[in-house]
Amino acid sequence: MRVKKGFKARRRRNRVLKLAKGFRGRRKNCYRRANQAVERALNYSTRDRRLKRREFRALWIVRINAAARQNGTTYSKLVAALRKAGVEIDRKILADLALALPGDFAAIVKTAQA
C-alpha cells in the first residue's frame, strides 16, 4: 500500500505558512519562499534578543550620564560613588528615575557623594 505522508507534510507546511503570516509578496503563501524567510527571521530574532539587551543598557547609561552631568558629576564617578556608598540600584531604575523623577535622582546623587 502506498503511503503519501500527506498529513505530516501538510502540517509542516501549514506551520511554516502560519509563521510567515504578515510577510509580503510570495513569502507569505509560497512554501519554499516562506520557509527561507521564516528561517532567516528566526535567526534574526535570536540574534536581536541579545542585541536588545546591549542597546537598552547603552541607552540607560546615556540617560544616567546626562542626568549626572546636570547634577555636577559624570556617569563613571556616580557609579563608583554609588558602589562605595553601598547603594544597590541598577542602571534601569536609575535611568527611569533620571527621566521621570529628577528630584529623587538628585537626592541619590547627593547620597552617593556624601
Curated annotation (Swiss-Prot):
The keyword rRNA-binding applies. The keyword Ribosomal protein applies. GO terms for biological process: ribosomal large subunit assembly; translation. Keywords: Ribonucleoprotein, Ribosomal protein, RNA-binding, rRNA-binding. It holds the Pfam family Ribosomal_L20. Gene3D superfamilies: 6.10.160.10, Ribosomal protein L20. CDD domains: Ribosomal_L20. GO terms for cellular component: ribonucleoprotein complex; ribosome. SUPFAM superfamilies: Ribosomal protein L20. InterPro entries: Ribosomal_bL20 (IPR005813), Ribosomal_protein_bL20_C (IPR035566). One of its GO terms (molecular function) is structural constituent of ribosome. Belongs to the bacterial ribosomal protein bL20 family. Binds directly to 23S ribosomal RNA and is necessary for the in vitro assembly process of the 50S ribosomal subunit. It is not involved in the protein synthesizing functions of that subunit. This is Large ribosomal subunit protein bL20. The lineage of its organism: Bacteria, Pseudomonadati, Myxococcota, Myxococcia, Myxococcales.
